[in-house]
């Protein structure tokens, strides 16, 4: 009798069910009974771990965790909707609130809207739309796409939360076929009509140079096309206002004959630059800086030096055997150092020039005290030359132009 009353564990398999690994029976696609759900929550409140609840009730650990997680989040133990879609959460009231939030703060995020709906009690945890649903509502219902109507009014797509209010007061924008130029102007884009008195006069002036015409003295050849100009405003017509406006427009485009000739020469040049024509870039006004009177002294010096270097007698002064004998100061002009050109005096004689003699002083002046400063009077005897005959030459280079160090004889004695 008991055997007949005991439920067959395999009978659930015939009803699209089965037995889990813990031995519990379940039906595929059907939620867990409310009694088991309530028992799971009660055991969780008693402090039983989810793994122990799973063993006691023979319910899979995933099912226990899912039920407890939903209970902790929403406070409900009801199962989800079986079949079909979820109940519609984008009610007109919710959509209006979302649109109002976006108008108040266009930069509000979807999750902020969701939290505000819950905080203000517009929706509860079961009916609040998800973040993706809020984004879809904003994209499809709050921001309407542009649909022009036959009367020219329509709504445009703007930034999130901003809507365009259709205005029937402004007339429709004229088509590009009627006014191809005006349709791209500001008035054409905004649909503002232009009255006859405010109609702008446009002069399209094409200025080009004809070389043959310029050479003949005709100046510039002007071709103008007047558009949207009232009748009688042609330059050769009777209206003086059109002529004055065109004259003011062309006044800045006139050139003198010299400017036209300069332009003609520039355009006749080849396309590629030439290194030999670099001198042409110097302005004619800069030629006064290099006048002949200013260059005459320099040219005279160059001429004298060239004539001195061209003297054939200089060849005899150069030593051909490359020997370097010790010579006196008077014969240094006839010697040549290796790797250096021969010294050529400006006067062509074997003597020092006047500028060189100016840097020389007689050797007798060095016989006195080398140091006259009080701090160095004690060193006069130590730094004095032991043999004054070394300074007996007629001329000796001074210390100022040479910049040499003290004599080495003073260091040899220490």
Swiss-Prot record:
The protein's matches in PROSITE patterns, at most eight in alphabetical order, are given as: PAIRED_1, PAIRED_2
Would you tell me the protein name for this molecule?
Paired box protein Pax-2
Disease field: Defects in Pax2 are a cause of developmental defects of the kidney, brain, ear and eye.
Q: Hydrolase: is it a keyword of this entry?
A: no
Q: Which GO terms describe its biological process?
A: brain morphogenesis; branching involved in ureteric bud morphogenesis; camera-type eye development; cell fate determination; cellular response to glucose stimulus; cellular response to mechanical stimulus; cellular response to retinoic acid; central nervous system development
Q: Outline the segment boundaries, as ranges, of region: PAI subdomain.
A: 18-74
Report residue spans for region: RED subdomain. Answer: 93-141
Show the InterPro entries listed in the entry.
Homeodomain-like_sf, PAIRED_DNA-bd_dom, Paired_dom, Pax2_C, PAX_fam, WH-like_DNA-bd_sf
Q: How does it assemble?
A: Interacts with ELGN3; the interaction targets PAX2 for destruction. Interacts with TLE4.
* Sample GO molecular function, one term: RNA polymerase II cis-regulatory region sequence-specific DNA binding
Give the superkingdom in one word. Answer: Eukaryota
Report the residues modified as Phosphothreonine.
225
Query: Where does the record place it?
Result: Nucleus
Q: Name one Pfam family in it.
A: Pax2_C
Q: Which UniProt keywords apply?
A: Developmental protein, Differentiation, DNA-binding, Nucleus, Paired box, Phosphoprotein, Transcription, Transcription regulation
Q: Which Gene3D superfamilies match?
A: Winged helix-like DNA-binding domain superfamily/Winged helix DNA-binding domain (1.10.10.10)
Q: What PANTHER family has UniProt attached to this entry?
A: PAIRED BOX PROTEIN PAX-2 (PTHR45636:SF19), PAIRED BOX PROTEIN PAX-6-RELATED-RELATED (PTHR45636)
**Summary of the tissues where the protein is detected:** Kidney and nephrogenic rests.
Q: What is its main location?
A: nucleus
């Amino acid at each position: 009798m008991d055997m007949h009353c005991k439920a067959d564990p395999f009978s659930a398999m015939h009803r699209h069910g089965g037995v889990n690994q813990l031995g519990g029976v379940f039906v595929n696609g059907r939620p867990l009974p409310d009694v088991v759900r309530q028992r799971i929550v009660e055991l969780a409140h008693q402090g039983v771990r989810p793994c122990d609840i799973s063993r006691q009730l023979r319910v899979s650990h995933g099912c226990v965790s899912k039920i407890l997680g939903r209970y902790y989040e929403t406070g409900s133990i009801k199962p989800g909707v079986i079949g079909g879609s979820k109940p519609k959460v984008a009610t007109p009231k919710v959509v209006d609130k979302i649109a109002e939030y976006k108008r108040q703060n266009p930069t509000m995020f979807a999750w902020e809207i969701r939290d505000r709906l819950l905080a203000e009690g517009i929706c509860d945890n079961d009916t609040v739309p998800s973040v993706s649903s809020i984004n879809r509502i904003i994209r499809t219902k709050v921001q309407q796409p542009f649909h022009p109507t036959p009367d020219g009014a329509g709504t445009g797509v703007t930034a999130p939360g901003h809507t365009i209010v259709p205005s029937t007061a402004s007339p429709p924008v004229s088509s590009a076929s009627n006014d191809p130029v005006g349709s791209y102007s500001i008035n054409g884009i905004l649909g503002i009509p232009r009255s006859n008195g405010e109609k702008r006069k446009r002069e399209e002036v094409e200025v080009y140079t004809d070389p043959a015409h310029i050479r003949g003295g005709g100046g510039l050849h002007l071709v103008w096309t007047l558009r949207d100009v009232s009748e009688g405003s042609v330059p050769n017509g009777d209206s003086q206002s059109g002529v004055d406006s065109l004259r003011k427009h062309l006044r800045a485009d006139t050139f003198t004959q010299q400017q036209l000739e300069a332009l003609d020469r520039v355009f006749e040049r080849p396309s590629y630059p030439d290194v030999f024509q670099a001198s042409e870039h110097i302005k004619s006004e800069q030629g006064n800086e290099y006048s002949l009177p200013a260059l005459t002294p320099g040219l005279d010096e160059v001429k004298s030096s060239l004539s001195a270097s061209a003297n054939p007698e200089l060849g005899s002064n150069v030593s051909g055997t490359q020997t370097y004998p010790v010579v006196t100061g008077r014969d240094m002009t006839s010697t040549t150092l290796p790797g250096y050109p021969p010294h050529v005096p400006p006067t062509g004689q074997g003597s020092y020039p006047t500028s060189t003699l100016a840097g020389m002083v007689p050797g007798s002046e060095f016989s006195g005290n080398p140091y006259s400063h009080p701090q160095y009077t004690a060193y006069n005897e130590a730094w004095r030359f032991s043999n004054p005959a070394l300074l007996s030459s007629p001329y000796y280079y001074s210390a100022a132009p040479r910049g040499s160090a003290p004599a080495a004889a003073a260091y040899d004695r220490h």
